[in-house]
Amino acid sequence: MSFVVIIPARYASTRLPGKPLVDINGKPMIVHVLERARESGAARIIVATDHPDVARAIEAAGGEVCMTRADHQSGTERLAEVVEKCGFADDTVIVNVQGDEPMIPPAIIRQVAENLASAQAGMATLAVPVHDAQEAFNPNAVKVVMDAQGYALYFSRATIPWDRDRFAQSRDTIGDSFLRHIGIYGYRAGFIRRYVTWPASPLEQIEMLEQLRVLWHGEKIHVAVAAVVPGTGVDTPEDLERVRAEMR
């Protein structure tokens, strides 16, 4: 199937300034992400950024850049600007690959596009099982709960579902009920155009999770378990050092 990858790459970051350009073993992080996306079979790959230095790094690597405004509140809002500038038809499948995932497996980029095509949902995403208690209680690891058909009920930085009886005894171990959301999304261009017309929801603003806007406005998000577990994303300086070590 045909799909387009857009990689939003915002330069400013409170925890890691200039994050897209941090060096990982001789290359800017955003270039590593671009190279992974190239292996996914995407028909077109566009890096959406608000900073000329990021644009120069991508162009030096032979990639396509779309310059966007600096005031977007989320990656999906940045994608919407690209969708309009490029004039994508409403039925174009767009995969949003985060610019801070230098170890993302190309296979799951394609997986989320294929899941969107087969699901009755405006949006598709992926998750992986959580087996580590520290991860289950980490607010930077977003958890998701789904219904019987694989559609998201809620995403949260909190530990959901809360295992009342187990956690009353101990929080050192967890069961098999937890899924960590992976920040990759598939949607059609027309859905992105609709998304940006909706006001931000209170839950989105509390949790700082853009996908909650979709659920708030009554749309479905299909969640599948990732075919390949992705490597570490980069949110903090500690994450960066871990990724550098893993990618050596």
UniProtKB/Swiss-Prot annotation:
Keywords (A to Z) from UniProt: Cytoplasm, Lipopolysaccharide biosynthesis, Nucleotidyltransferase, Transferase
One Gene Ontology term, aspect cellular component: cytosol
Family annotation (InterPro entries): Cytidylyl_trans (IPR003329), KdsB (IPR004528), Nucleotide-diphossugar_trans (IPR029044)
Main subcellular localisation: cytoplasm
CDD domains, alphabetized: CMP-KDO-Synthetase (cd02517)
Catalytic activity: 3-deoxy-alpha-D-manno-oct-2-ulosonate + CTP = CMP-3-deoxy-beta-D-manno-octulosonate + diphosphate
EC number from the UniProt entry: 2.7.7.38
Functional pathway: Nucleotide-sugar biosynthesis; CMP-3-deoxy-D-manno-octulosonate biosynthesis; CMP-3-deoxy-D-manno-octulosonate from 3-deoxy-D-manno-octulosonate and CTP: step 1/1; Bacterial outer membrane biogenesis; lipopolysaccharide biosynthesis
Localisation: Cytoplasm
One Gene Ontology molecular-function label: 3-deoxy-manno-octulosonate cytidylyltransferase activity
General function of this protein: Activates KDO (a required 8-carbon sugar) for incorporation into bacterial lipopolysaccharide in Gram-negative bacteria.
Similarity section: Belongs to the KdsB family.
This protein's name: 3-deoxy-manno-octulosonate cytidylyltransferase
Biological source species: Cronobacter sakazakii (strain ATCC BAA-894)
GN (gene name): kdsB
